[in-house]
Regions:
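Short, solvent-exposed loop/turn segments at secondary-structure junctions
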Residues: 34, 104, 139-141, 162, ...
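Functionally critical loop-and-helix segments that line ligand-binding/catalytic clefts
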Residues: 1-12, 17, 150-217
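Conserved beta-strand termini and adjacent loop/short-helix elements that scaffold enzyme active sites
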Residues: 67, 135-137, 181
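Alpha-helix initiation/capping motif
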Residues: 20, 45, 137-138, 146-147, ...
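Structural recognition of alpha->loop->beta junctions
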Residues: 82-99, 103, 144-175
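Basic/polar, cationic surfaces and motifs that engage anionic cell-wall
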Residues: 113-116, 120, 134-135, 146-152, ...
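Aromatic-lined carbohydrate-recognition surfaces of secreted/lumenal glycan-active proteins
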Residues: 125-143
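Substrate-binding cleft of extracellular glycoside hydrolase catalytic domains
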Residues: 1-131
Length: 217
C-alpha cells in the first residue's frame, strides 16, 4: 500500500489548499534552509506558517524538511536546533522531520562530513522526541555518504520517472520509506510540484509513540 503526497516550499506560494486537499494525502513542507557559500545563514521558509496552518485546516498530515549546507556533525546539529526553535516547537507533525542532503556546498564535505551532518541533525531532534530522517538521492547516499550507519533513520529518496512503483534498486532497501517520484512533474492547482509516495503509515506510528509533538497513546 502507498499513500500519495507532495512536498512544497515558498516556491509554491499562492497554491490553493482548497484544491490541493483533494489529492494530497500528506505534505512535506520546507521548514527552513541555509544559504550556501561563504556567508551561510539559516532562514525559515517564508511560507511555512501559512502552509502549516492551511494543512491543519484541511486535516492534511504534515512533515518537514530542512535544506542544509552542513559539513559536519556540529553544523548538522545547529541546523536542527534552529529548526526546533523556529519551526517545530509547539506544533504537531504526522510525518518525519528530514535533513535535505543535496546542496553542492554540503557535498563538498565528503562522505564523512555529510554522514556526520545527518547524525548531528537527526540525533538532536531524536533527543527532543522527533521521528527523523534524511532526503538524498541514491547516488548521493551510496557514493557521497556512508549508507550503513544511516539505516537507523528513515530515507526519503528522489528518483524521478513516470512509473507508479519505485525502481527495484531502491524498492527493497530497508529504510526507503518515501519515494519522490517526480521533481515538479505534478500539476496541481496551477503549480508544478514534487510528488511523493509513502510506504509507511507514519501518522499511526508517530502518534502511538508520542513523537513529533504528540502525547504517547
Amino acid at each position: 500500500m502507498s499513500t500519495h503526497g507532495y512536498d512544497i516550499s515558498a516556491y509554491q506560494r499562492g497554491i490553493s489548499f482548497d484544491i490541493l486537499k483533494n489529492s494530497a494525502r500528506f505534505l512535506i513542507l520546507r521548514g527552513g534552509y541555509t544559504t550556501n557559500g561563504g556567508r551561510r545563514k539559516r532562514c525559515t521558509d517564508q511560507y511555512f506558517n501559512t502552509f502549516y496552518n492551511e494543512a491543519k485546516k484541511y486535516n492534511i498530515p504534515v512533515g518537514v524538511y530542512y535544506y542544509s549546507c552542513a559539513q559536519n556533525y556540529q553544523e548538522g546539529k545547529e541546523d536542527a536546533v534552529y529548526l526546533y526553535n523556529n519551526v517545530l516547537k509547539g506544533r504537531q507533525f504526522e510525518y518525519p522531520i528530514y535533513i535535505d542532503v543535496e546542496d553542492q556546498w554540503m557535498l563538498k564535505a565528503g562522505r564523512t562530513g555529510c554522514t556526520n551532518a545527518v547524525h548531528g541533525f537527526c540525533q538532536y531532534l531524536e533527543s527532543k522526541g522527533y521521528y527523523t530522517g534524511f532526503y538524498a538521492g541514491y547516488y548521493v547516499l551510496y557514493n557521497q555518504m556512508f549508507p550503513e550507519p544511516l539505516q537507523r533513520y528513515t530515507w526519503w529518496c528522489p528518483w524521478w520517472n513516470k512509473s507508479t512503483t519505485p525502481p527495484k534498486k531502491i524498492a527493497t532497501l530497508p529504510n526507503m520509506h518515501i519515494w519522490q517520484h517526480s521533481g515538479g512533474g505534478c500539476h496541481v492547482a496551477g503549480y508544478d510540484i514534487d510528488g511523493d509516495y509513502s510506504y509507511v503509515d507514519f501518522p499511526s506510528i508517530i502518534k502511538k509513540a508520542g513523537l513529533n509533538g504528540y502525547e504517547k497513546v
